[in-house]
UniProtKB/Swiss-Prot annotation:
Stored PANTHER family: DNA GYRASE INHIBITOR YACG
Protein name in the entry: DNA gyrase inhibitor YacG
NCBIfam families found in the cross-reference section: PRK01343.1
Species the sequence originates in: Mesorhizobium japonicum (strain LMG 29417 / CECT 9101 / MAFF 303099)
Family under the similarity heading: Belongs to the DNA gyrase inhibitor YacG family.
Keywords annotated in UniProt: Metal-binding, Zinc
Taxonomic lineage: Bacteria, Pseudomonadati, Pseudomonadota, Alphaproteobacteria, Hyphomicrobiales
Cofactor(s) demanded: Zn(2+)
Amino acid sequence: MNSDSKITPLRPKRPCPECGKPSARDTFPFCSARCKDIDLNRWLKGAYVIKARDDEEEPDADEPK
């Protein structure tokens, strides 16, 4: 009996967010290192932005806490 037949996947396969191909275990949630790098490059270039709430004020560095 082959021991590989008893191995279950860690997570269900989902489509790659970049190209739609099935994801790979070693580059999850992407299908390849290429798609993973494309996504990282978009984050580094600022193409993706997580908006902050407008009512949040940043504390001044000069003010004591």
